[in-house]
Amino acid sequence: MGKKRTKGRSAPDTVASESAEPVCRHLRKGLEQGNLKKALVNVEWNICQDCKTDNKVKDKPEEEAEDPSVWLCLKCGHQGCGRDSQEQHALKHYTTPRSEPHYLVLSLDNWSVWCYKCDEEVKYCSSNRLGQVVDYVRKQAGVRTSKPAEKNNGHIELENKKLEKESKNEQEREKSENLAKETIPMDSASQITVKGLSNLGNTCFFNAVMQNLSQTPVLRELLKEVKMSGTIVKIEPPDLALTEPLEVNLEPPGPLTLAMSQFLSEMQENKKRVVTPKELFSQVCKKATRFKGYQQQDSQELLRYLLDGMRAEEHQRVSKGILKAFGNSTEKLDEEVKNKVKDYEKKKAIPSFVDRIFGGELTSTIMCDECRTVSLVHESFLDLSLPVLDDQSGKKSINDKNVKMTMEEEDKDSEEEKDDSYMKSRSDLPSGTSKHLQKKAKKQAKKQAKNQRRQQKIQERFLHFNELCATDYTEDNEREADTALAGEVEVDTDSTHGSQEEATQIELSVNQKDLDGQESMIERTPDVQESPEDLGVKSANTESDLGIVTPAPECPRDFNGAFLEERTSGELDIINGLKNLNLNAAVDPDEINIEIPNDSHSAPKVYEVMNEDPETAFCTLANREAFSTDECSIQHCLYQFTRNEKLQDANKLLCEVCSRRQCNGPKANIKGDRRHVYTNAKKQMLVSLAPPVLTLHLKRFQQAGFNLRKVNKHIKFPEILDLAPFCTLKCKNVAEESTRVLYSLYGVVEHSGTMRSGHYTAYAKERTASCHLSNLVLHGDIPQDCEMESTKGQWFHISDTHVQAVPITKVLNSQAYLLFYERIL
């Protein structure tokens, strides 16, 4: 029998040394890999089998509320609670008389091996038999890494020190808690606690984000509402003839939402000092399989997948409720019921709890310089991805010159292209927003012959289509073709006519997919496209949102060697053939119809033409020019994100109003075949709905050619941020005549190291929950100037299980990757 020790979990510092050799003489008798493999099939991890049999897992007294350490027998796979528990089932399992003794056990908390016979720690490395067995158990438990002990050595040491302090020196812990209470006097109901999170294996990116979400008390409040059984939602009818709203009884929330609620509850408990978010991470991996395998990941992507996953579950929940309200629980539905369900789903009576907390709105304002018509595009966002400039001004100017020279050459050679052969060398234009297209553009020389063959097939296809449609053209169209203006490029005898510039612009707007033989939809609707400078500036969730309307041609300048394509007249035939194929000739020019993709996972965009005063269309709530010079501040990043742009040259606006005026009336010819007018325009993206919780993402990870790099430049960010200089004059959720939209910093995610090997940590602010923020989210009460709350609190630096109090100066000097601000005014 082994001697009873007060701490069976403590491990010496050299437990994970790669060069250490096992010194225990009981390895041969105490290790049985065959029995382990059989025992670990469909096993429930981290639960004492004997306690579960005795029904003591749920009926524990309050003083044993914290889960005891669980030890795995390496002989038979038995899981028992350790010596620090009341029952000590792991020790009893060893002392039970058997023909073959069970000497060795493995801690499922810190993966240390203990020999009861030697009564001491057993050293191992990944190359020997014991290390291989431990690695196998870790993989079965869901923690996959080749050198487990070495990678987690620091975390093991920190966790063991914390456990020793917890068991041997209770008074010191009470003193630290009292000190925190003195620093931040809180009410017990609104107290926000800070705990460590276990690293499941390269999951620091997950832990850092969850630390900040756990410091968002309004999220916990809304999740309590979501979990309430029998929730009834009233949806206004889409048909004006119906007056009674539809009452929808919602089902329980989805598994990801429930796991999130359970995690926040565990973070609020007083007994646990370290939380293991295994269930929540498992649900995230089910929603997004890219996070499986315990590899290094991006914390901002994790945040987006998490929020989008919970929002999708809420949308599905409402859809099922609407279906049940119509009395159809089966999958087979008639068309009438399907249409009704879709109509009610489009009403969106109540936004999801994710949108209510993190959701804001961006408005892109575009004004034609010729007719002064103002058009708006509204789109929602959950976070803003801001550019981080890294002394690239020199490179940008060089790229600008290259683009300009290429444009001039293309204009000069456009007439010569009529007689050129189809086989002509060119460099394809990458979109600037897709890494795939960037790589494809660089490999275009190798695929030139293949692409040309595909283009020839497309040309034959659409020329055949034009021949079929030629008989439908009126005599007016034929006369137009015969009397084409000098300098116009005649694409086809019965197809659209346009100037060289127009043909070039149409050609440039074709998607890269056309080169692969795929059709692309080109809608004839007024719109603007992101300017070259705007590439890499908009947030990840809004970079491609303006694609709902016809883009004016753009020329990306973010990449070295990006040149405009040189097209022959045959290729222009293809482009205009595509244009004729996809245009709807029956559209009334008096109506501006925008086709919005119906995507349940992304918020729809709203397009409208406003009779706004052109002088105030681009005004903001507060002056913004002061932030145009300081390039190392978060305000300058916001300034770049919301700057006023000029749409000109290759990025002109296709103006519907000017196009109608060019045709001398609102009606085009029968086939809708008319001249498109591109004009210079102004464009600006501003915040039109300030979110309750503002999440800012600094785009530090960038691609330069084939290489990936991280921008390590320090970006200054304030404790109190005023968003007013970046909001529209008619911003929602802002008090009348207010010129301030204030946010208080409460969370930071920091990335240290390189892109290939780095570590995520979090800074979180322990504070009193804001009642004004809760009123804004729950009841829509807009905070007033006289109601601004205090932002006092204590900051903590959290690196997985290690939690340390830090001053605000250290927080402000950190290399921020994600910033979390809560609305205070």
Curated annotation (Swiss-Prot):
One annotated GO molecular function: transcription coactivator activity
PTM text: Phosphorylated at the onset of mitosis and dephosphorylated during the metaphase/anaphase transition. Phosphorylation by AURKB enhances the deubiquitinase activity.
Active site: C204 (nucleophile), H759 (proton acceptor)
Subcellular location: Nucleus; Cytoplasm
Gene Ontology BP terms: cell division; DNA damage response; mitotic nuclear division; monoubiquitinated protein deubiquitination; positive regulation of DNA-templated transcription; positive regulation of ribosome biogenesis; positive regulation of transcription by RNA polymerase II; positive regulation of translational elongation
Annotated EC: 3.4.19.12
Notes on the domains: The UBP-type zinc finger binds 3 zinc ions that form a pair of cross-braced ring fingers encapsulated within a third zinc finger in the primary structure. It recognizes the C-terminal tail of free ubiquitin.
InterPro entries: Papain-like_cys_pep_sf, Peptidase_C19, Peptidase_C19_UCH, UBP16, USP_CS, USP_dom, Znf_RING/FYVE/PHD, Znf_UBP
Quaternary state and interactors: Homotetramer. Associates with late pre-40S ribosomes. Interacts with CEP78; promoting deubiquitination of tektins.
Sites of Phosphoserine modification: S188, S414, S520, S531
GO cellular component, one term: nucleus
Keyword line: Activator, Cell cycle, Cell division, Chromatin regulator, Cytoplasm, Hydrolase, Isopeptide bond, Metal-binding, Mitosis, Nucleus, Phosphoprotein, Protease, Thiol protease, Transcription, Transcription regulation, Ubl conjugation, Ubl conjugation pathway, Zinc, Zinc-finger
This protein's name: Ubiquitin carboxyl-terminal hydrolase 16
Family: Belongs to the peptidase C19 family. USP16 subfamily.
Acidic residues compositional bias, start-end: 408-419
Enzyme class: hydrolase
Positions with biased composition (Basic residues): 436-456
Binding site for Zn(2+) 2: C48, C51, C81, H89
Positions that bind Zn(2+) 3: C73, C76, H93, H102
Ranges where the USP domain occurs: 195-824
Gene3D superfamilies: Cysteine proteinases, Zinc/RING finger domain, C3HC4 (zinc finger)
General function of this protein: Specifically deubiquitinates 'Lys-120' of histone H2A (H2AK119Ub), a specific tag for epigenetic transcriptional repression, thereby acting as a coactivator. Deubiquitination of histone H2A is a prerequisite for subsequent phosphorylation at 'Ser-11' of histone H3 (H3S10ph), and is required for chromosome segregation when cells enter into mitosis. In resting B- and T-lymphocytes, phosphorylation by AURKB leads to enhance its activity, thereby maintaining transcription in resting lymphocytes. Regulates Hox gene expression via histone H2A deubiquitination. Prefers nucleosomal substrates.
Compositional bias ranges of the Basic and acidic residues kind: 164-180, 393-407
Top-level division of the source organism's lineage: Eukaryota
Region annotation Disordered: where it falls in the sequence: 1-20, 164-184, 393-456
